[in-house]
Amino acid sequence: QINFRTMTMSTSPIIIVPARLASVRFPKKLLADAGGKPLIIRTAERIRSQAPEFDLFFAVDGVELKKVLELAGYNTVLTSPDLPSGTDRIAKANQELQKEFVINVQADEPLVTRDHILSLARAISKPRVSISTLASVFQTESDFLDPNQVKVVLDNEGNALYFSRSPIPVSRAKESKWGNEKTARGYKHMGLYAYNREFLEFFLDSKEST
């Protein structure tokens, strides 16, 4: 059990939310109304209520999001709108923040829980762990078959082996049905991550060298 209160300011995990307004599938989704407030503010409030002990930053792609968040009292780091992924945005933001451990919560994830955040914080604070993510067992066959739900195959120690939108793993046994003990139900990838600073630096360096 890790006591985050006893960790130093430099080693205690922080939360960075990568926030991109120029979404291709849903432009300005993060500013869409969610019960009277922008979606990104709902996410921010949820994170703050669930994990108030963690410093929270938003890595934004422009001044519009920056103004909305700062007006509501949240910290932001301005990053290039041309960055291709949330991990790129977090890595660039952490070049400025220089934190040892970073938890990545998606900007459109207003249902994130304290357990999610603490699980990632514990995992990334362990020795020899450079990146961690979350997965949960599928509860229904319809979700398992849904291509919009990302699946992950794990080894016996919980390490991710393979990600896919296809229903994996699948038993070859003809008599296997959903929920049958012979059928592996599969895990849903939850899209939450944690990284250490060394991994984020390596991530950026590897891109710059290609």
Give residue ranges: language-model regions.
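Short, Lys/Arg-enriched N-terminal segments with co-localized hydrophobic residues
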Residues: 1-8
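Short, high-confidence coil segments that cap the C-terminus of an alpha-helix
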Residues: 53, 99, 126-130
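Residues that recognize and position ribonucleotide moieties
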Residues: 24, 110, 193
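N-terminal glycine-rich phosphate-binding loop and ensuing alpha1 helix
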Residues: 11-60
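Conserved core of the sugar-phosphate nucleotidyltransferase
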Residues: 113-206
